[in-house]
Amino acid sequence: MSTKSMIRDVELAEEVLSEKAGGPQGSRSCLCLSLFSFLLVAGATTLFCLLHFGVIGPQREEQSPAGPSINSPPVQTLRSSSQASSNKPVAHVVADINSPGQLRWWDSYANALMANGVKLKDNQLVVPADGLYLIYSQVLFRDQGCPSTPLFLTHTISRIAVSYQTKVNILSAIKSPCHRETPEWAEAKPWYEPIYQGGVFQLEKGDRLSAEINLPDYLDYAESGQVYFGIIAL
């Protein structure tokens, strides 16, 4: 029953009793009835307000400012996915600065990484399992001045698959830092030429991957992290 209906019923009851009541006793009865009616209406109004503004009644479940509980399914799914990805093959090798005149990959320097079955053999990364892999590599060339003959710098990533044992280039780039010869009377200014390559490939267990260049004498080893090669299982 709504509050308006309750008030209407009380008013009708007052009118009926007022007509029937007479004399002093009737006046006192009307006064008591009016007081009771007022209290009833006030109580009903208060109850309606409390229910309307949610002070009483069913309580809503509140979320903490930090978000959902740590036991919620999305967090569990994310944790499971993270644990699964940590078991995937990954490798990151860097250039051996103690091998001038050639590009030799090394897995024992700081920031190098070999995990979950990947091996470095004969300067090649050996894939431990079938799947999709991100393959990436960067080299940095540098020198001063430009020769009279054209200078072309190449960077190639190749694959030797277990299924056909033929070396195939899967990523390749070529750059020319010099557009004209530096005159004899001019100052030979330094130049830098980075080449970065990366792509996703379907590989098989036992595939061998190599990253090579054509002119290792131009490699820049001045800073760590400039020449690297790696794979990440997806």
From Swiss-Prot:
GO BP terms in the entry: extrinsic apoptotic signaling pathway via death domain receptors; immune response; necroptotic signaling pathway; negative regulation of protein-containing complex disassembly; positive regulation of apoptotic process; positive regulation of canonical NF-kappaB signal transduction; positive regulation of extrinsic apoptotic signaling pathway; positive regulation of JUN kinase activity
GO cellular component terms, semicolon-separated: cell surface; extracellular space; plasma membrane
Positions of N6-myristoyl lysine lipidation: 20
Membrane-spanning ranges: 34-56
Glycan attachment residues as annotated in the record: 81
Domain THD: 89-234
Compartments reported by the entry: Cell membrane
Molecular function terms, GO-annotated: cytokine activity; tumor necrosis factor receptor binding
Residue numbers of Phosphoserine PTMs: 2
Positions of disulphide bridges: 146-178
Modification(s) after translation: The soluble form derives from the membrane form by proteolytic processing. The membrane-bound form is further proteolytically processed by SPPL2A or SPPL2B through regulated intramembrane proteolysis producing TNF intracellular domains (ICD1 and ICD2) released in the cytosol and TNF C-domain 1 and C-domain 2 secreted into the extracellular space. The membrane form, but not the soluble form, is phosphorylated on serine residues. Dephosphorylation of the membrane form occurs by binding to soluble TNFRSF1A/TNFR1.
Quaternary organization: Homotrimer. Interacts with SPPL2B.
Name recorded for this polypeptide: Tumor necrosis factor
